[in-house]
Amino acid sequence: MPPFARPSRVLRAVVLGDLALDVVLAPARLLERGTDVPGVVRLHQGGSAASTARWLARLGVRTTLVCAVGRDGPGRALVAALRNDGVRVRAARPAGSRTGRIGLLVDAAGERSFVADRGAADLLSSDDLRPGWFRGAGVLHLPAYSLLGSPLGGATARGIALAREAGARISVDLASAEPLLAIGRRSAHRLISDASPDLLFTNTDEAAAFLGTVDPAGLATFAPVVIVKGGAAGATLLVRGDGGPALRLEVATRPIAAADTTGAGDAFDAGFLAEWLVRDRATTLAVLHRAAAAGHRVAARQLGRPRRELRLP
């Protein structure tokens, strides 16, 4: 079964956010203080925005990634790898900066802990953006940390305005709770409200941290369609109607054993968005169910394949 319906026209998307070098540490056993343990160290293309863009391109969506990288070997290698996957990369290269690096420690269950050195990824400015990049796009997708800080937050605000002017919908993934909560829950809520997303993606842990409760129902105040990713437990969709509480839709998935879950959430977003674009961005329960099912299938593809090693020059 294909991951989503075959489009009868060109589908376009813009993703704005991080392209970074993932340095993955997968120890064969528990770390021991003051000594070394055997394991595997790998270099991969990273960044939530870049991973979503790559999957969108693989699924047949004409995709542009707007990002910033350093004027260095990792930046050149990352841009080249994404272009090889069919992504149109519009990368600013701020002087004196280095490409972002993310350290990932992967445990035996495949779960990850991160150390983020975002570097150039946070230095995209509004002057770097061009209106033509957004023309014809059906959706602008971004991880929530693209809304944070300066100059990146200003660039993202301009990107949202340009996308709206071009007729695109806005899709936001909370992506990571810690950067949002670092500014305080009230400020984080205001940031998402100001972005006014049409679609809001999150996982169960991020939703609980963002709201301060395990019940995700409150997310429906931030977007008309909310997608809560629960991993092997499936996805919960909250869909606002005409008054009254949001409708709740559960979409099951098949559990998959994975040594590394990196990128599964980004792949889900891409699968969902691709199917949603094919279905003319409709928000009926039937279309949203199809989109979530497509997201599950693409996430399974991400989990079922080894991540490709990045070759540095």
Q: Where is each model-derived feature located?
A:
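Hydrophobic beta-strand scaffold residues
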Residues: 63, 89, 170-171, 226
